[in-house]
A protein has these predicted regions:
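Extracellular/periplasmic carbohydrate-active domains that bind, remodel
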Residues: 1-317
Length: 317
């Protein structure tokens, strides 16, 4: 950011903000940012931004926010909730949006100092961006196994700076062209305001249809001494195209406690075709229907230091 790379829209510390029916194109930095505001409505906003690095579509670090009916096509994260200050990003509802990205479509983080509370996201579609001049994951990270431009993660929930993610519902999402449909990461990178371990509690992800490309499975991972707690994932149809032999599977996944959170952060092919779960206390998988279109010899689930795990109605074809 700064004077050399301004955002197109930037509200900070404002009350009762409404942005509606505008088109924003090719920002120098983040396209629009709402920081420490109270009472924000963003409706019917169209974003097309593929001019620079850091071309996020919509960044929210505010309270009492409604986002609806937006079309976002950008190079960096499409919808990004941030927590850069000493107050949490909370009471946020997002619905009826089209999200296209070369990075993450729905993301909490990376900045996660205070956290994210009471958030619902529903009725959205996710797809690969229209352009890819910068990232080109298929060229720069060939081990991922993608052949085209892709979204990094459809849903990425990241708390790594001492903040908390709690009371979150994400539902009715259709996604295609993604590397990893669901990425949940509790890390221990920085502690500024809370001086305590990051936390992720009470999250529900439901009614998801996803077509993924490449070898990086979904992952839900905490760190030693920092468990993710009370996660429910239900009613998911997942179709993957990964081709992985048993000899390619690496059971020694590094902890990467303070690394930048991203689906490829472990630097290896995860030992699950569906969900790799580690350092979690309380997780339920209900009605997960997974289909592999190529020969993937990994099991659907791989668990490491997981307590109170349940699964019901989960199938792998």
């Amino acid at each position: 950011g700064g004077p050399r790379r301004p955002k197109i829209i930037y509200f900070i510390g404002c009350n009762n903000v409404r942005v509606q029916d505008v088109t924003l194109r090719n920002s120098a930095y983040w396209t629009q940012d709402y920081e420490k505001c109270n009472g924000v409505i963003v409706r019917g906003v169209k974003v097309y931004s593929h001019a620079n690095w850091n071309n996020d579509g919509l960044d929210i670090d505010s309270r009492n926010v409604v986002v609806s009916d937006c079309y976002i096509d950008c190079d960096d994260d499409a919808l990004c909730l941030k927590s850069d200050t000493d107050t949490p990003c909370e009471n946020v509802t997002v619905t009826n949006c089209v999200l296209k990205s070369n990075c993450n479509a729905i993301k909490f983080g990376t900045s996660s100092y205070s956290g994210f509370k009471n958030v619902t996201i529903s009725n959205c579609t996710i797809d690969r961006a229209s352009e890819d001049h910068i990232r080109q994951w298929y060229k720069n990270y060939p081990w991922i196994g993608t052949k085209h431009k892709t979204v990094v993660a459809g849903i990425a929930l990241e708390s790594v700076d001492g903040g908390i993610i709690e009371n979150v519902s994400i539902s009715d999402i259709a996604m295609q062209g993604v590397q990893t449909p669901i990425f949940v990461r509790l890390g221990d990178r920085k502690r500024t305001f809370s001086k305590q371990m990051s936390r992720i509690n009470d999250v529900m992800i439901s009614r998801i249809i996803a077509r993924s490309e490449g070898k990086i499975a979904c992952s839900i991972t905490g760190v030693p001494g920092g468990d993710i707690k009370n996660i429910v994932i239900s009613d998911v149809i997942l179709v993957t195209d990964a081709e992985v032999a048993k000899t390619d599977i690496d059971l020694k996944v590094p902890e990467a406690i303070d690394k930048y959170p991203e689906n490829r952060m472990f630097g290896t092919i995860l030992p699950a075709s569906g969900f790799y779960v580690r350092h979690v206390n309380g997780i339920a998988f209900n009605n997960i229907k997974m289909t592999t279109t190529n020969k993937d010899e990994r099991p659907m689930f791989h668990l490491n230091d997981v307590k109170n795990f349940t699964q019901q109605g989960c199938t792998l074809n």
